Amino acid sequence: MSETDMKLVVVGAAGRMGQTLIRTVHEAAGVRLHAAIERSNSPFIGRDAGELAGLGPIGVPITDKPLEAFVEAEGVLDFTAPAGTVEFAGLAAQARIVHVIGTTGCSADDEAKIRAAARHARVVKSGNMSLGVNLLGVLTETAARALSAKDWDIEILEMHHRHKVDAPSGTALLLGEAAAKGRGIDLADQAVKVRDGHTGPRPQGTIGFATLRGGLVVGEHSVILAGEGELVTLSHSATDRSIFARGAVAAALWGRSQKPGFYTMLDVLGLN
């Protein structure tokens, strides 16, 4: 541990992703766990964060006081829920620190509040923090631009574990936005997220989404470009959620030297 290590806070510390973040921060170079936060009625308040994450004691108790933690830290890693993320965005803006957001399912109003907080904080937000998925997004945009809507249909298929509460996934939407950008269209106008009953022929130029849920699947995503007589499939499989945690740590370290503003993983990876 070095005095120059970036001091990070993990919020939602008791969740699956929170525990993964704690382990990743503990093992990564250039960062250290400053605090771990849970909701005020959590039975884990007071527990050692390292013990909860399977590391053994690390001397960082779980607390329910985010602002106190934020003002002494340099960054926060947030894979919680939209309401919590909006609250943490305001606190991160007060503390003027880096806020890395992997939370999905945010509404347009949530997004507006997060972007407002980015006037004072350095916000890095992405539907997926992994290098592979963000590269897949770039490839999807390129393919969508090269293959015309007249002859090629785009469908996005995703599968996640049974506990995931939002659909389509943030990653599927990220890929949909990439495809829409390649086509020069607005995803909100062209997305088809539900098909049921007699739907009629597929409208030209739309981008379809299909969602699967079951088991303990970390994340499977495929972008399918279907033409006449040929099929192009671009896919990514996540086998360990630590890939998202490593990406979040990389985003925090990158954001440390940036000006306040709203960024994505494409900025972090130099792909924008």
Swiss-Prot record:
Q: Which segments cross the bilayer?
A: none
Residues annotated to bind (S)-2,3,4,5-tetrahydrodipicolinate: 161, 170-171
Active-site annotation: 160 (proton donor/acceptor), 164 (proton donor)
- Primary enzyme class: oxidoreductase
Q: What is its EC number?
A: 1.17.1.8
* Keyword tags: Amino-acid biosynthesis, Cytoplasm, Diaminopimelate biosynthesis, Lysine biosynthesis, NAD, NADP, Oxidoreductase
Q: What is this protein called?
A: 4-hydroxy-tetrahydrodipicolinate reductase
Origin species, per record, is: Sinorhizobium fredii (strain NBRC 101917 / NGR234)
